[in-house]
Amino acid sequence: RHEALAALHGLPKQIEDALPAMRETAQMLSPLYASAHSFFYLGRGHAFPLALEGALKLKEISYIHAEGYASGEMKHGPIALIEPEFPTFALAFNDALFPKVKSNIVEVQARRGPVIALANPGADLHVEHLWTIPSAWGPFNAFLALPAMQLFSYEMADYLGKDVDQPRNLAKSVTVE
């Protein structure tokens, strides 16, 4: 419990310190992937909801089709879509699931799919673009992954000339009647 509280306390500074490098990486990647019409976002365990959120953000502001999947489900259909023009954004944190995520990345690459891997320092990955973000305690990696994915979506949209402040067909709030 003490370890988690200490890690949580340090997160704001850790995120603040990481943001400039995240923006720089997102700006570097956006022209390289701007011609893609679709993206996969893959994650396992705690990273699966992050993959869903990353795909949603890319769709919302860049208008690029994106789907988030649990990495383990990739072989149940989505893998058929992988090709050189269909990049994959893989969340590959240094946790117990890393070997399985790495295996999924290799599967994508075997089908000539380009991979951006968002990973922690020391990740043993050989991908087209390894995007290293600082490590955080356990599930707190999410707090560092989310801004990176949001900046990637933002920079993609900006590079493509989209209005990032007023995405088309989106309401600022949702009401249920």
Label each PLM-derived region with a short phrase.
Residues R1-A6, V127-E177:
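Short alpha-helices
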Residues R1-G10, L91-P134, F152:
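Glycine-rich phosphate-binding loops that contact phosphosugars or nucleotide phosphates
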